[in-house]
Amino acid sequence: MQNFPVISSILSATPVGLFLQDKYQFSVNATCKLLKTGINHSYLITDGASNFVFRLYSLNWRNQTEIREEIKLLNLLRDNNIPVSYPLKDAAGDYIQTLNAPEGNRYGVLFSSEGEKQLNFSTDLHHKIGETMARIHHVTHNLQLQRVTYTPQVLLKDSFERLKQFLPADTDEMQWMAATQKYLLDELAMADAGKLRQGVVHMDIWFDNLNITEDGEVTIFDFDFCGNGWLCLDLAYYILQLHSTEKVEAERDEKLKSFLAGYESIAKISDEEKRLLPMLGVSMYFFYLGIKCQRFDNWANVFLNATYLKRFINLLVKKYFDENVVKAINVN
């Protein structure tokens, strides 16, 4: 019988748990449970009262240099007392594990875990998240990692090329995306770079990557997309997600105001950064649509099709553009 190559697999939680039990010297009562199969696969390790998350990177998603740079960043932030989920060494002093999966060797890292996710949270917590993001940026300002730099090419051009594989160019949605891409590229090219802080960005701070304890302590995790770029990209993405999750406008505006106040209690947002936030938010939509297309074979195929993309563009991307970018143009 012919053997066929594998592009993706889900490793059974039980042997993964035994592997980690040996590597990290967990107790014999430690358990391992599959949490999520997404861009990477996550496993919850519970040993007594302690929880950990083991991230198993998809094949060829991140190389060892990129993972080491993420680890270096997290350790730097932890050393500066910033509440992040941090990597843990095994008994031999190693951070990165190599697991022989059917598709090839996959890398894994064990992270600390504390608190739980919340879809909606208080105005005060948004203020605290703003403070925490600013503290991260204070540390990462002018820092550079050996990872991707999020240029307009990466955000808008590369992502749009991937989208072309899934939506015909003559559809209304693709024609709108093409026109919007040109507008955004032109605007970003004219941005006053001297007034835009640069450094290392998280790129994915939203409720799904925040854990909150019962006493209101916030931990930021999942730095898988960290890289180099304008620091205001993180602000733009958080605001974008706030618009997506908070449907009552008055409550959303109050929480947004609190988030920005929290941020600016630590670090000043320049007028040029504020001007670009709506445009960068739309650019982030472009980028993550591109990621979904890039990872069709081993993630997004369960939902990604032409109908999904048309709805996403009309109900999220275009709506956000009209309500924020176009509105700002009309005001000015």
Report each predicted region and the residues it spans.
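ATP-binding pocket architecture of kinase catalytic cores
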Residues: 48-145
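Conserved NTP-binding catalytic cores of kinases and kinase-like/nucleotidyltransferase enzymes
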Residues: 1-89, 214, 328-332
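A cross-family kinase active-site recognition segment
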Residues: 120-175, 198
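All-alpha amphipathic helical-bundle segments outside canonical DNA-binding/catalytic cores
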Residues: 269-281
